[in-house]
Amino acid sequence: MKTPAIELDERLDTIPGTTISLIQKIDGTAFSIDTLLLADFVSFTPEMMNSADLGSGSGILAFLLKYRNKNLQITGFELQNEFFELSERNLKLNSQYEGVYFENMDVRDIPARILPESYDLVVSNPPYFPAGSGRLPEKTTRAQARHELNGTVKE
């Protein structure tokens, strides 16, 4: 495998126990144990073929689910351009995972563009804090990942 270009604010990680390599930001917007636990928590049924990952970030959850279920088609939806571009780079890095796709869009726009029955499984590792609560990180990407600045879980 050719080593990808890594920016100064990034690192290349290998996810233990998998064949997944992932470029991540080193400024605190990297995935956490919560994402690994969520991926392990998901139960698959034989009829599950299409999945959506809402707020897919770097793509880690989509790759973990695909690693666990080779037949699953997964589309990650990510609003933040920086993370969408990172997920696309990670997709090139993990080209062995056919059937993983990413779209740069607001998850609140999905109902207007995609039929709800298009997906058998929908997953998300949403922001932890409601807007206006807690201390807001200075970096915009980190703030949006941790706080409901672009919509609520209910939306």
Protein language model regions, located:
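Short alpha-helix immediately C-terminal to the canonical SAM-binding loop
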Residues: F84-E85
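Conserved SAM-binding loop of SAM-dependent methyltransferases across substrates and taxa
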Residues: S58-N71
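Mobile active-site "lid"/loop adjacent to the S-adenosyl-L-methionine
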Residues: P126-E155
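Conserved class I S-adenosyl-L-methionine
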Residues: M48-G55
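Conserved SAM-binding motif I beta-strand of class I
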Residues: Q73-E78
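Class I SAM-dependent transferase core
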Residues: T3-T45
